[in-house]
């Protein structure tokens, strides 16, 4: 096994059973905690649906078929086939389909912007999921221990704050418990469902799609509004695709079809049966279906499950941001590894604290899970619509499927997604504006950074001196040579690094060995170590060293030098090597490019990004930073 192959979730290849257990603990947390609030929200008084046995049968029928069509058929059967070297998620899918279109074409730009916008919507989900999940679980105290009702929000805030505070220490130790806890959770969901099903088995009639269609036709507009709440059972479906690289498609499919889907369906049918038997249970169908003696233990188990679901979303936000950094859409940030065994476990302090502030603010502002339910959904449906569109492009361009088949599948899935999307649009005024605003702000920042970097590269190429002719001329009339190795980090091997020009201008020396090191991010998640480094000898002790990384990897200078030693015979003595880095100060100008205010925003982002020496993990005492100003 190569070193890069270990960059998946586990360093050693575990058995399928272990992967299934791991997937149950991580992948299904979000969708697995939806029973806490989904059905309760479907019968919210604001929807204007008169409570009746037929309404219960209709809503349960819609829930059932939505789960079958969107999760089981669309995601598990079709979308999970679209892997980028084993990785899933909207960014991996975007990178996959971009290979099939001409670079810099209008089509490529549209696909790229769709992928980035879909990814940005995830940040809205990353704020809402921990808040609504933990809050809805702790609200069980209102049923199990009414005297503690006033402490619901404080307890929620303490749990969430603790969750974010432990992120810097990693979750490797407690992560081993995630699988068993979530397995217990799903078994409990199924058992509760069966317990209530036997009291009103007529709820099983909901399997017939007639009841779903009849409900939609009879209630028309009100039923359309209810679709926005029905969608809550599907939140977390995207996680099945996103986490595919951690566990593999097969373990996720086994976990879904063997354990998760049956238990979720049993629980939703059980909640429906309880409502047929006890209509007053509509106040909180989930906790009122639990026998009184077990209500408090169930609150504790539900809280554990929602914390695990929140952890999965937080880890997803770290992973997504790390990918966006490598793809050039986000400024460099400190990326810390929290586990020596599980390379996928990373921690980004900036993202963590920003999420903490937003999540705490959301809980304090919205106060109840039913209020948060209105804000939930719009961001997820947006990502789902984009994933469906990109998957259709993949079917046609990558898999070369028949256009008629692609049209039928793509249109069918898109119509279902758009119905849920339109229903969620009705919730914008009630709170849906928040994740939309958050996602749109993130998209604007990412595109500003991407456009600014393009401008910066263009200016550097315009003003730059071709590297190879310059080195040839320099070696013909060399300055004083000094012992040791100089490594010049550069974004382009076509032009002379500004740091070299400044070194020659001020120090008037050239090291006996000069290495121009550049990092290239490819459109695949991982690069094999055998293909990671390549070298070009320019003569006279000057070399171009190119290191390639996947978009799920973080560059590490020390590892690159070790690899160059092993693979290319280029030995580096760290204490005799100096690393020269140009620290660019961006100056907004009226040159053609972006508006001045947007260039100022880019300059601020550039200034506040992590130092290259920190990001590339270069020993601080071996770094020489040389400042330069660049107008854009």
Curated annotation (Swiss-Prot):
Membrane topology: Multi-pass membrane protein
Single annotated GO MF: symporter activity
Catalysed reactions, semicolon-separated: K(+)(in) + H(+)(in) = K(+)(out) + H(+)(out)
Keyword presence, GTP-binding: no
Bilayer-spanning residue ranges: 19-39, 59-79, 110-130, 146-166, 178-198, 213-233, 256-276, 298-318, 346-366, 373-393, 403-423, 428-448
Location(s) in or outside the cell: Cell inner membrane
InterPro entries: K+_transporter, K_trans_C, K_trans_N, Kup
Region forming the signal peptide: none
Domain of life according to the entry: Bacteria
A cellular component term, taken from the record's GO annotations: plasma membrane
Keyword list, A-Z: Cell inner membrane, Cell membrane, Ion transport, Membrane, Plasmid, Potassium, Potassium transport, Symport, Transmembrane, Transmembrane helix, Transport
Statement: the UniProt record of this protein carries the keyword Membrane: yes
Family annotation (Pfam families): K_trans, K_trans_C
Family: Belongs to the HAK/KUP transporter (TC 2.A.72) family.
Function (record text): Transport of potassium into the cell. Likely operates as a K(+):H(+) symporter.
Database matches in HAMAP family: Kup
Protein name (Swiss-Prot/TrEMBL): Probable potassium transport system protein Kup 3
Organism of derivation: Cupriavidus necator (strain ATCC 17699 / DSM 428 / KCTC 22496 / NCIMB 10442 / H16 / Stanier 337) (Ralstonia eutropha)
């Amino acid at each position: 096994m190569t070193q890069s192959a270990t960059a998946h979730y586990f360093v050693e290849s575990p058995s399928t059973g272990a992967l299934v257990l791991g997937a149950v603990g991580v992948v299904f947390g979000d969708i697995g905690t939806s029973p806490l609030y989904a059905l309760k929200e479907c019968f919210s008084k604001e929807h204007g649906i008169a409570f009746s046995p037929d309404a219960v049968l209709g809503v349960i029928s819609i829930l059932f078929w939505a789960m079958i069509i969107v999760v089981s058929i669309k995601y598990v059967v079709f979308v999970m086939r679209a892997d980028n070297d084993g990785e899933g998620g909207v960014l991996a899918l975007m990178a996959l389909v971009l290979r099939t279109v001409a670079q810099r074409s209008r089509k490529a730009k549209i696909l790229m912007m769709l992928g980035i916008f879909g990814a940005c919507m995830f940040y809205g989900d990353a704020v809402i999921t921990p808040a609504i999940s933990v809050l809805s679980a702790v609200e069980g105290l209102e049923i199990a221990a009414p005297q503690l009702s006033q402490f619901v929000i404080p307890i929620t805030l303490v749990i969430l704050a603790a969750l974010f505070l432990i992120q810097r220490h990693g979750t490797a130790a407690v992560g081993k418990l995630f699988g068993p806890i979530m397995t217990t959770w799903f078994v409990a969901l199924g058992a509760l469902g069966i317990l209530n099903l036997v009291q009103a088995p007529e709820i099983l009639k909901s399997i017939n799609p007639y009841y779903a269609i009849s409900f939609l036709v009879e209630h028309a507009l009100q039923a359309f509004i209810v679709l926005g709440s029905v969608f809550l059972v599907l939140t977390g479906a995207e996680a099945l695709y996103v986490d595919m690289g951690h566990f593999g498609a097969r373990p996720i499919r086994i976990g879904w079809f063997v354990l998760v889907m049956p238990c979720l369906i049993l629980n939703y049918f059980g909640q429906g049966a309880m409502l047929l038997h006890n209509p007053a249970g509509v106040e909180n169908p989930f906790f009122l279906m639990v026998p009184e003696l077990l209500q408090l233990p169930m609150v504790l188990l539900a809280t554990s499950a929602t914390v695990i679901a929140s952890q999965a979303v937080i880890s997803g936000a770290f992973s997504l941001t790390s990918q966006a950094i490598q793809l050039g859409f986000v400024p460099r940030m400190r990326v810390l590894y929290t586990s020596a065994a599980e390379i996928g476990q990373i921690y980004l302090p900036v993202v963590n604290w920003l999420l903490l502030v937003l999540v705490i603010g959301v809980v304090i502002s919205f106060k109840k899970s039913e209020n948060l339910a209105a804000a939930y959904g719009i961001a997820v449906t947006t990502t789902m619509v984009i994933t469906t569109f990109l998957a259709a492009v993949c079917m046609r361009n990558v898999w070369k499927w028949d256009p008629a088949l692609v049209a039928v599948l793509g249109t069918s899935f898109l119509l279902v997604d758009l119905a849920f999307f339109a229903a969620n649009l009705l919730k914008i005024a009630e709170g849906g504006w928040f994740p939309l605003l958050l996602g749109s702000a993130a998209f604007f920042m990412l595109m500003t950074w991407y456009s600014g970097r393009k401008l910066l590269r263009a200016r550097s190429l315009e003003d730059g001196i071709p590297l190879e002719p310059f080195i040839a001329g320099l070696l013909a009339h060399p300055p004083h040579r000094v012992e040791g190795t100089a490594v010049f980090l550069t974004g382009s091997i076509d032009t002379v690094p500004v740091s070299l020009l400044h070194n020659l201008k001020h120090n008037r020396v050239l090291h006996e060995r000069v290495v121009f090191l550049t990092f290239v991010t490819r459109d695949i998640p991982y690069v094999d170590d055998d293909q990671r480094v390549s070298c070009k000898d320019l003569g006279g002790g000057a070399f171009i060293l190119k290191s390639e990384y996947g978009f799920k990897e973080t560059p590490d200078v020390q590892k690159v030098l070790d690899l160059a030693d092993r693979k290319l015979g280029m030995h580096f003595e760290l204490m005799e090597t100096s690393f020269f880095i140009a620290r660019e100060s961006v100056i907004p100008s009226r040159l053609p490019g972006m508006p001045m205010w947007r260039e100022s925003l880019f300059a601020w982002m550039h200034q506040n990004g992590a130092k290259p020496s920190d990001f590339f993990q270069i020993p601080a005492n071996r770094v020489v930073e040389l400042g330069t100003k660049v107008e854009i």
